[in-house]
């Protein structure tokens, strides 16, 4: 094995996504052969003594992938959040997994739980343009002008313009409407801020797809393990360069066996 960047080795050992591992390095919590290291340095785990917070770096783990349906009111975090339930509470037997594609507290839907730092990077970094698809319930139906502005990109606070997105009205819902949105980026609370800029209000937000992986028939709080073939297909979907497309059928079917569900107490 040749030398690898520290954040890659750390992610492979299940310490989190590459971005999270980079933050550990920046914070001075990582050393190689007794010396603090800087971001971008490399090491060989066969010969170098790599430590995080003074503890030896564990060997690379066998990769694991879980599709999880995060309910509303559950925090997309591994750390305790007072009395609030976290995604770790929903998959208590998968302590070394971390969430990829976080959702805010009031949003729901698909989250990937994994210890594969490389896949996590490809699913979340904007340069890979991995598609995420959402169903969004708006308090009132948007007009065509609002939809067109959303499709072209909306200027957010600070002057940042969002990337083009595929947006269409799916069905009416009283005075409001369900809207389908496909995006190649996913900044924190981006859809909610876009809606606010357009004079709209989000009532409900559900993510139904990440790359080739669909939420499928998973109910809130349930999770299922992906097969190796599904994981490879998901990784391959991060290389796609075609224009965003709305899903018409499951690309990864939600298998009924091996479904986990947190029992209510």
Regions found by a protein language model. Name each.
Residues 1-265:
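Basic, flexible Lys/Arg- and Gly-enriched helix-loop patches that mediate nucleic-acid binding at interfaces
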